[in-house]
């Protein structure tokens, strides 16, 4: 077993690069013996060096806590997401009952004028950074009740929306895809300066 060399020369592992300075492209302290020794030690042990913001983004995407704001029939599809068939918790997306413990709010259903202040109050109670998923045609733009006098024509008039999930009602797979898109968006953008 093992790798056989093409020539009679023994196989040698690559030299460890250590911590790379992004401005120069060379290892940090490459001309300093002390830093060269530390870089060799870290590279030899298999350490991963990253920025703090990337570490926070990675941790945040794997531990999103969501709060339900089910207003109509879309809430039934939202509940299916936690059931064993889809089991959204395997993606690190767990439900919470309190807005003070949640990062994500899923607005599912028709938002009326009377309910809009409550939605804003719950949104304001969530800690930063906070994200909102608008689920279904009614939450996205009023849906079937768009021309009613008592319906808000899209919850983006009350709170900022990060992900729109279309459908009437959208399937649990569509909402799961929206959750995965939100995690991708969090990885792509910084959470500290949002």
From Swiss-Prot:
Chief location category: membrane
Keyword Transferase belongs to the record: no
Membrane topology: Peripheral membrane protein
HAMAP family registered for this protein in UniProt: NDH1_NuoB (MF_01356)
Description of how the protein assembles with itself and partners: NDH-1 is composed of 14 different subunits. Subunits NuoB, C, D, E, F, and G constitute the peripheral sector of the complex.
Cofactor(s) for this UniProt protein: [4Fe-4S] cluster
Keywords on record: 4Fe-4S, Cell inner membrane, Cell membrane, Iron, Iron-sulfur, Membrane, Metal-binding, NAD, Quinone, Translocase, Transport, Ubiquinone
Gene Ontology MF term list: 4 iron, 4 sulfur cluster binding; iron ion binding; NADH dehydrogenase (ubiquinone) activity; NADH:ubiquinone reductase (non-electrogenic) activity; quinone binding
Function: NDH-1 shuttles electrons from NADH, via FMN and iron-sulfur (Fe-S) centers, to quinones in the respiratory chain. The immediate electron acceptor for the enzyme in this species is believed to be ubiquinone. Couples the redox reaction to proton translocation (for every two electrons transferred, four hydrogen ions are translocated across the cytoplasmic membrane), and thus conserves the redox energy in a proton gradient.
Source organism (scientific name): Rhizobium etli (strain ATCC 51251 / DSM 11541 / JCM 21823 / NBRC 15573 / CFN 42)
Binding site for [4Fe-4S] cluster: 73-74, 138, 168
Name the record gives this protein: NADH-quinone oxidoreductase subunit B 1
Family: Belongs to the complex I 20 kDa subunit family.
Gene Ontology biological process terms in this record: aerobic respiration; electron transport coupled proton transport
Positions of region (Disordered): 1-23
Note accompanying the cofactor annotation: Binds 1 [4Fe-4S] cluster.
Locations listed in the record: Cell inner membrane
GO CC annotation terms, alphabetical: plasma membrane; respiratory chain complex I
EC number: 7.1.1.-
Superkingdom per UniProt: Bacteria
Biased composition (Polar residues): 1-12
